[in-house]
Amino acid sequence: MSFATLRPAPPGRYLYPEVSPLSEDEDRGSDSSGSDEKPCRVHAARCGLQGARRRAGGRRAGGGGPGGRPGREPRQRHTANARERDRTNSVNTAFTALRTLIPTEPADRKLSKIETLRLASSYISHLGNVLLAGEACGDGQPCHSGPAFFHAARAGSPPPPPPPPPARDGENTQPKQICTFCLSNQRKLSKDRDRKTAIRS
C-alpha cells in the first residue's frame, strides 16, 4: 500500500486568485527602491486601468503646460503691448494738436515735446499779458509793460511789486527779458509800418 504525499497549496492562491507572490529578485527591487507599494503584483488589466487614470489626472492637474498656465503669459504680454501703443498714440495726438496752436517762425518748424511744452507755457503767459495790457500797449510787447500774468492771475497771492523806475544813462541795468511772441509781434508791427510808409511816399 503506497501513500501519496500532498503538498499544501499556498493560501493566497484561493483567497486572492488575481494576486501572485513576488519572486526574491522583485522583492529585493521593491525594497531598494523605497516605494510604498505592497510586495505583490496585481493583474495586468487592473494595472493598465490604474495607470491610465493616473495619467489622465496628471494632465488635468498640470493643465497641459509648465505651471498649469499655457498661453497666459503671451496673452498678457500682447495686452500690455497694445495698451502701451494706445497710450503712445494718445500722447502723440495730443502733442500734435497742441503744436498747431503755437505760432512759430517758420510755421512748419519742427519742435520736440519738451520744446512744445515750453513754448505752450510761454504762449499762455503771453496771451494773459495781452489781456491785461489791452490796447494800452502800443509797442507790441505786453509782457514788458505790466506785471507778469502768472502773478496777477494767481488767486490769493499778494499784489506784485511796482515796476522799477527807468534807469538813467550810464547806469548798469540788467538785460531785458525777451518774450518770443512779443518779439514776433514787434517785427510784424515794424513791417506794417514800413509798408504803410512806403505806400504814402
Curated annotation (Swiss-Prot):
One of its GO terms (molecular function) is DNA-binding transcription activator activity, RNA polymerase II-specific. Residues 1-92, 148-177 are annotated as: Disordered. The keyword Magnesium does not apply. Residues 157-167 have a biased composition (Pro residues). This is Basic helix-loop-helix transcription factor scleraxis. Its main location: nucleus. It is found in: Nucleus. It comes from Homo sapiens. SMART domains: HLH. Plays an early essential role in mesoderm formation, as well as a later role in formation of somite-derived chondrogenic lineages. Residues 59-69 have a biased composition (Gly residues). Residues 70-88 have a biased composition (Basic and acidic residues). PROSITE patterns: BHLH. Signal peptide: none annotated.
